[in-house]
From Swiss-Prot:
Entry EC number(s): 3.4.24.-
Compartment annotation: Cell membrane
Gene assigned in the entry: ftsH
Cofactor(s) for this UniProt protein: Zn(2+)
Source organism: Aster yellows witches'-broom phytoplasma (strain AYWB)
UniProt protein name: ATP-dependent zinc metalloprotease FtsH
Main localization (coarse): membrane
Note accompanying the cofactor annotation: Binds 1 zinc ion per subunit.
Sequence positions that bind ATP: G212, P213, P214, G215, T216, G217, K218, T219
Keywords: ATP-binding, Cell membrane, Hydrolase, Membrane, Metal-binding, Metalloprotease, Nucleotide-binding, Protease, Transmembrane, Transmembrane helix, Zinc
Binding-site residues, Zn(2+): H433, H437, D509
Extracellular topological domain residue ranges: 34-115
InterPro entries: AAA+_ATPase, AAA_lid_3, ATPase_AAA_core, ATPase_AAA_CS, FtsH, P-loop_NTPase, Peptidase_M41, Peptidase_M41-like
C-alpha cells in the first residue's frame, strides 16, 4: 500500500466518523425539540373530539400521498405527525365540504433555516451510507487478498523468510555433531566464496538431507550453517506446501524458490520433508496434489528451473519413505545421519545448556552424561530445564542432585502419582517384582548395571529399575541379548517363587522379551535355524507355514531357557532378593550406592543408623532391661507387618493385584500401576 493510498484510506475513515457524529447530533436535536411527536391514532382522536385548531402540512415528496403535519390544539399544544395520508387530512363529506371543518388546513411555510437543515440532513445521510459502503468494500477486498494469498502461497512464502546473522547463531551454539559440522563447513565456504569453486569447475552440493531421531539437532545445524555464512535463511515445513486445493502446493514451491533466487546465495530449509516428498504411486486413482508438489520441487532443485546459488537443506525422521528421485545426486547430494549423541557429545550438550543455570558443586555433568545413554539433545535440555523448575518451585538458589534425579525420572517415566497408595499386599508384590529385576541385573554376566530401584508410583509405572549398559557399544552380542531377556523375566520369577502366584505386572516384560527373541530368530540368525532372515507381516510372510512353526518354537525355546536361568539365579540369591525387597518396603527408593552396599555388606548403614537414632528415645522411655527387648525395639511396626519369609506356604494369595504393566527398555524396567 502506497503513501497516498494510506492517506486516502485515513480520509475516508475520518469522513465516516464525522458523518456518524453529525447524524447522532441531528437525532439528538430532533429528540429534544419542543414539539411533541404522536402517532396517527392520536391524530384521529384529536380530530373526532374537535380539539384541533390549526393544521400546517408539508409534503414529503412531490405528488406524494403522505405529508408531515404540525397540529395546534385548542389548548395551545403543538404536535408533530409524520407520514399522515392526505386523504385523512383533506377528507371531504358527500356535500363537498371537508369532514373536519372546525380547523383550518394551510401549507406550512418553510424558512431558510429549515430548508438548509433538511438538505443537510439528507446529504449527511447519503454521505454516511457512502462512507460505510467504502469501508465495507475495503474490508471485503482485504479478506479476498488474504484468501488469495493463502491459496497462492505468496503470503506464506514471505512469512518464511528469516535472516540469520552470523553473530546470533553459529556452530558454537550447537554442541556435539563435530563430524557433521566439518562436512557442512564446505557449504559455508561455497556460500562465502562461490567463485573459488566455479573456477575449478566444481559443483557444490545442491541439497543436504539430515535424517535421524527426533531432537538430535537437525534444525539447529541448518540454522548454524546460515549463521556461519551470513546468508538469508528461508525456513519452511513440509506441511506448508500441503493444501486441499490441487496445485496450491506446487505454486507455493515456485514462490519460495523464486524469492530465494532473488536473495541468492541463500539457504532454503525444509523441515519434515516427508510430508511433501513421499514415494509416488502410493495413492490409488492416479496423481494428486501432493505428487504435483513433489514434481515441482524436483524441477526446482535440478531441472529446467534449477536455481543457482540456492542450497536446500532438508530434515526428516523417516528417510525410508522419501521418493528415490529426490535422493539422487544432483538434488540431495549429501546425506547425513544425525545420530543420538555419545557420552562425549552429551557432556558438551549439558555444559552448553547449563551455562545459564545455577548448579551446586556436587553435580558432575560428566557423571550425568554417563547416566543418560540414549538421550537426545532435546531430552538433555529438557532434563536440565525440569531440574531448574523443580529448584525454583522449592525457592532454592541452586539445583542439587535431588532435582536432577527427579527430573530424570520425570523425563523417563513421568511425574509422581501421589494419589496412588498401595495396600500391604500390593506393596510387597511390587517390591519383590522390582527386586527380582535387580537381582538378575546384579548377578548375571553381560547384564546392564542397576542404577536405581523404586516402588513409588510414577506416570503409568508402579515401580521401575533404571539400568545402564556397562559401556556404550554399537553392537549387541548374543549373550547381551539373552541377558536382557533374562532381566525382563526376573520380576515374574520373583512373584512366582515368593507368592506362589503371579500378577499381570509382567505384561510389558513379556512383550519386550518376545520382541528381542523374535529379532534373534528372524533377523540376527542367533538360533538353531541358522544365519537366515525371515520377514513378513500380518497379511503375508515370505516363509512357509511349517517354517513359521519352527520360528515360533525357537522363540519359545529362547524364552523358556532364559526363564529357567532367571529362576535358578533368584533361588541361589534368595537372601539378596529378601534384603532388597525389605529396604524397598522401608525406603521405597534405592540408588546405586545403596545397592552396592547391600551387595557388599547385606545392609544399608545410613538407614540402620537413622533407625537406631529414631528408636533410641523410645527405648529410654520404656526402660527396657534386657538386651533381647532392646533388639526387638529396633524393628519398626512396618517391619513387623511386612517381614519377609521364604516359606511359600505361608504367603497370602494375591487376588487383587495391580496391573503392573512394565514399561521396559534397555535402560528402564518399570511396573505399570494402572488397574485393568
Amino acid at each position: 500500500m502506497s503513501f497516498f493510498d494510506k492517506i486516502f484510506k485515513k480520509f475516508h475513515m475520518g469522513v465516516l466518523y464525522f458523518a456518524v457524529i453529525l447524524i447522532g447530533a441531528t437525532f439528538i436535536y430532533c429528540y429534544f425539540t419542543k414539539h411533541e411527536k404522536k402517532d396517527n391514532n392520536t391524530f384521529d382522536a384529536l380530530a373526532q373530539k374537535n380539539e384541533i385548531e390549526k393544521i400546517q402540512y408539508n409534503p414529503i415528496f412531490a405528488n406524494s400521498a403522505f405529508c408531515d403535519i404540525v397540529v395546534t390544539t385548542t389548548d395551545g399544544r403543538v404536535i408533530d405527525f409524520f407520514n399522515i395520508p392526505y386523504d385523512k387530512v383533506f377528507e371531504k363529506k358527500p356535500n363537498g365540504k371537508y369532514k373536519y371543518n372546525t380547523y383550518s388546513v394551510d401549507p406550512r411555510p418553510w424558512n431558510g433555516y429549515e430548508h438548509v437543515f433538511w438538505v443537510f440532513r439528507q446529504c449527511l445521510t447519503m454521505l454516511f451510507f457512502y462512507c460505510f459502503f467504502l469501508f465495507f468494500a475495503d474490508t471485503i477486498k482485504q479478506m479476498g487478498q488474504e484468501i488469495l494469498a493463502s491459496t497462492s502461497g505468496k503470503k506464506g512464502a514471505k512469512s518464511r523468510k528469516v535472516i540469520i546473522n552470523h553473530k546470533r547463531f553459529t556452530f558454537s551454539d550447537v554442541a556435539g555433531a563435530d563430524e557433521e559440522k566439518e562436512e557442512m563447513s564446505e557449504l559455508i565456504d561455497f556460500l562465502k566464496n562461490p567463485r573459488k569453486y566455479a573456477a575449478m569447475g566444481a559443483r557444490i552440493p545442491k541439497g543436504v538431507l539430515l535424517y535421524g531421531p527426533p531432537g538430535t539437532g537437525k534444525t539447529l545445524l541448518a540454522k548454524a550453517v546460515a549463521g556461519e555464512a551470513g546468508v538469508p535463511f528461508f525456513a519452511a515445513s513440509g506441511s506448508d506446501f500441503d493444501e486441499v486445493y490441487v496445485g496450491v502446493g506446487a505454486s507455493r514451491v515456485r514462490d519460495l524458490f523464486k524469492e530465494a533466487q532473488l536473495a541468492a546465495p541463500c539457504i532454503v530449509f525444509i523441515d519434515e520433508i516427508e510430508a511433501v516428498a513421499r514415494k509416488r504411486g502410493s495413492n490409488i486413482g492416479g496423481s494428486n496434489g501432493s505428487e504435483q508438489t513433489l514434481n515441482q520441487l524436483l524441477v526446482e532443485m535440478d531441472g529446467f528451473n534449477q536455481k543457482m546459488g540456492v542450497i536446500v537443506i532438508a530434515a526428516t525422521n523417516q528417510p525410508e519413505v522419501l521418493d528415490s528421485a529426490i535422493l539422487r545426486p544432483g538434488r540431495f547430494d549429501r546425506h547425513f545421519n544425525i545420530t543420538l549423541p555419545n557420552v562425549k557429545d552429551r557432556e558438551a550438550i549439558l555444559k552448553l545448556h547449563a551455562s545459564n543455570k545455577k548448579l551446586s558443586e556436587e553435580i558432575s555433568l560428566e557423571e550425568l552424561a554417563k547416566q543418560t545413554p540414549g538421550f537426545s539433545g532435546a531430552q538433555l535440555e529438557g532434563t536440565l530445564n525440569e531440574a531448574a523448575l523443580l529448584a525454583a518451585r522449592r525457592n532454592a538458589t541452586f539445583i542439587n542432585k535431588k532435582d536432577i534425579s527427579e527430573a530424570l525420572d520425570r523425563i523417563l517415566i513421568g511425574p509422581t502419582k501421589k494419589s496412588k497408595k498401595y495396600n500391604d499386599k500390593e506393596k510387597r508384590m511390587v517390591a519383590y517384582h522390582e527386586a527380582g529385576h535387580a537381582v538378575i541385573g546384579i548377578k548375571i554376566p553381560f547384564a546392564q548395571i542397576v542404577q536405581k530401584i523404586t516402588i513409588i508410583p510414577r506416570g503409568n509405572a508402579g515401580g521401575y529399575n533404571l539400568m545402564l549398559p556397562q559401556e556404550e557399544t554399537f553392537f549387541s552380542s548374543k549373550k547381551a541379548l539373552l541377558a536382557q531377556i533374562t532381566s525382563f523375566l526376573g520380576g515374574r520369577v520373583a512373584e512366582e517363587l515368593m507368592f506362589d502366584d503371579v500378577s499381570n505386572g509382567a505384561y510389558n516384560d513379556f512383550k519386550h522379551a518376545t520382541q528381542i527373541a523374535k529379532l534373534m530368530v528372524t533377523k540376527y540368525g542367533m538360533s538353531d535355524l541358522g544365519p537366515v532372515q525371515y520377514s513378513g507381516n500380518t497379511f503375508q510372510n515370505d516363509f512357509s507355514d511349517p517354517k513359521g512353526l519352527e520360528i515360533d518354537q525357537q522363540i519359545q525355546k529362547i524364552i523358556a531357557n532364559c526363564y529357567q536361568q532367571a529362576k535358578q539365579i533368584i533361588q541361589e540369591n534368595q537372601d539378596l532378593l529378601d534384603t532388597i525387597a525389605k529396604y524397598l518396603l522401608e525406603i521405597e527408593t534405592l540408588n546405586k550406592r545403596d545397592i552396592d552396599e547391600i551387595v557388599a555388606t547385606g545392609k544399608i548403614a545410613w538407614w540402620e543408623k537413622e533407625k537406631e537414632e529414631t528408636n533410641a528415645p523410645t527405648q529410654t522411655t520404656s526402660q527396657m532391661s534386657s538386651n533381647n527387648e532392646t533388639t526387638n525395639t529396633d524393628k519398626t511396626p512396618l517391619n513387623d507387618e511386612l517381614e519377609i519369609t521364604t516359606n511359600l506356604d505361608n504367603q497370602e494369595s494375591n487376588e487383587s493385584n495391580p496391573n503392573n504393566n512394565e514399561k521396559a527398555s534397555p535402560e528402564v524396567l518399570s511396573t505399570d500401576s494402572e488397574q485393568t
